[in-house]
Each structure stands twice: as C-alpha cells, then as structure tokens.
A protein has these predicted regions:
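Carbohydrate-binding surface patches
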Residues: 183-191, 207-246
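Short, solvent-exposed loop/turn segments at secondary-structure junctions
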Residues: 1-3, 78-82, 134-136, 220-222, ...
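Active-site-proximal helices and loops of the catalytic beta/alpha 8
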Residues: 1-67, 72, 118, 135-163, ...
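Acidic/polar loop patches that form or flank catalytic/metal-binding clefts of enzymes
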Residues: 126-130, 170-178
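Solvent-exposed beta-strand/loop surfaces of large extracellular or lumenal domains
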Residues: 254-276
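Aromatic/acidic polysaccharide-binding cleft in carbohydrate-active enzymes
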Residues: 9-12, 74-100, 116-155, 206
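Intrinsically disordered, low-complexity repeat regions of secreted/extracellular protein precursors
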Residues: 191-205
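C-terminal beta-strand-rich structural cap/linker in extracellular carbohydrate-active enzymes
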Residues: 268-296
Length: 296
C-alpha cells in the first residue's frame, strides 16, 4: 500500500492490514543502503541514520493498531520493486538503462543478511519474496520477476533463512513482544581517520550517521537484544539493556551472528554489569542475543 493506510485500518471493518512499505520496507532500505525501493534514487544522507530510521518507524507505525501491525506484510523485496540484494550495490537505475547484469554487480550479501535479521525480529509478519532466500537479484519490475536460480542458489543464504525463520517461530517475544530502541555508547575501531560524529562516546542516544541499530523485543519471559553494525569498521558498543527488563547483572546468550563471511549459530555468552552490555561488533554484522528468565 502506498500512502497512509490509517483511513482503511482505524475503523477495523475494512482492511486487516497492508503490505508494509512505509513502516518497514522503505525505512529499512534507506537505513541499510541509502536507496529508494525501486533503485530509482539514492539519498546517501539517510544511509546509516538511526534518527531518520527511528523517526520514520515511529511515525508510520502509529497508523496501525497493534493487531494490524503484528500481521503487516514486512517484505524486503516484491513484484513491484528492485530486489533488496540488488539495492545493496547502491546502483541507481533500471534494467533498461543499466542492463540486467548490473543488478548482480557489487552486491553485499552481508548487508542483505542484516536486513533479514531485522525482518525476522521486527513487529510484523516476515514475508519472503521467492528467490530472495537464494540470493536472486534484479532491478525493478519486470527484472525483479526472474526465474528462480535452479542449480545456482546461494546455499549458505538458504541455510541462513532456514535457521533464522526457525528462531523467529520458536520465540514468542520475536513475534508479539514489545519493541524498544536501546541507548548506549559506541566507538569505532580500525579507522585512523574517524570523523567527529563517528566517535559517539558520551552520546546516550546512538543517533546520527552512525550505521548502528540497537533494539529489544521482549515479554515477561524472554528478552532479545538485536544489534546491527552496517559499517565497514568494527566497533565496541556499551548498551543499556536494563531498560527492556534484563537484570542489571545477567548473562546473555548469542542466538545467531551474521557477518561478511557468512553466519554462525555457535553459542557465546556476554555478561551484563550494572545493566550495561559491552560487546564488540564485526563490520557489516548483525547479532541476536537472548535472556530467558525461565532459565535464570
């Protein structure tokens, strides 16, 4: 649905929900790629801007009742827009002007996996457009309707989808839990030419052009912390996680991590001290951490 769906949703006797462009696909695409969802325009100033991402999400999510939001179709790609994998190459144009091969050039699978992590942990109904799970590329309609890549699938990406879908289905907090943007401090590593706004020590809102998205999904039993580092540098993060109900002294379990080389389900523990989590994030990575009260 294009435009504000409020008039169709607020009475409860017309639409149940919508294809969630305004409150999911578009803000996430701007944040991770700086691209418009058709690949028709680039806005570099929006890439990595947590402020713009959060403001957009809060504004457009307000058009939904909770029940409508939780079943909204949260897509990364579909039949009307360029494939999200293609958007990661940040090429502006269409197949008619750039050629179909350009849709596959310079793509960033790690950024695509970051998007899938958000898709599977954000309020709504994750909806996968055929072929996305196999790494299919394509500019906007009709190039986005390519044949499924039989025999040429990205097997690692398929396995990743299978595992993160399982995680989504196994944990109610990721489906119906509350959502909270988390606050903290971070510091980039491995870059001798940091801009002033890249060193965020003392900034308690993680706002600005920082390419770092941190939020929680939680209910009374489980608390999940999701961190996405969409930057080409590693970074050390100190995150206030007590706000989402995690005890001030606790141990969080890593559920999954995605990075430039792939993904891993290898468990790892992180200590929380005085309500603060300290964690090092690899470049172009996404991490899901969990605290389960029933086991503590």
């Amino acid at each position: 649905h294009y435009g504000d769906p409020k008039e169709w949703l607020q009475k409860g006797d017309q639409w149940d929900t919508v294809m969630n462009y305004d409150a999911f696909m578009e803000p996430l695409t701007w944040f991770l790629t700086g691209m418009e969802k058709h690949s028709d325009e680039a806005k570099p100033q929006l890439k990595g801007s947590v402020k713009d991402f959060e403001d957009s999400m809060r504004h457009y999510m307000a058009s939904f009742q909770t029940s409508q939001l939780l079943c909204a179709m949260n897509e990364l790609s579909n039949h009307d827009h360029s494939r999200f994998m293609t958007r990661t190459n940040e090429k502006v144009g269409r197949a008619a002007t750039l050629g179909t091969a350009a849709a596959e050039e310079g793509i960033k699978p790690a950024v695509f996996r970051e998007a899938v992590v958000v898709q599977m942990t954000w309020p709504g109904a994750p909806t996968i457009y055929y072929g996305d799970e196999a790494g299919l590329c394509g500019f906007t309609d009709p190039d986005n309707r390519r044949t499924y890549p039989w025999g040429k699938e990205d097997i690692v990406l398929i396995d990743f989808h299978r595992d993160i879908i399982r995680i989504h289905k196994e944990h109610e907090a990721l489906r119906t839990g509350s959502l909270m943007f988390l606050k903290g401090d971070d510091n980039l590593r491995g870059d001798d030419n940091l801009r002033g706004d890249d060193n965020l020590r003392g900034d308690n809102n993680l706002r600005g052009d920082d390419n770092l998205l941190c939020y929680a999904r939680f209910n009374r039993r489980e608390q999940f912390v999701v961190l996405v580092n969409n930057k080409e540098q590693e970074r050390d993060v100190e995150l206030e996680v007590w706000q989402c109900g995690i005890p001030k002294k606790a141990v969080l379990e890593r559920v999954i991590i995605s990075n430039e080389t792939g993904y891993s389900l290898m468990p790892k523990q992180y200590e929380v001290a005085d309500g603060v989590l300290k964690i090092s994030l690899q470049k172009y990575s996404a991490v899901i951490l969990m605290y389960d009260r029933s086991e503590n």
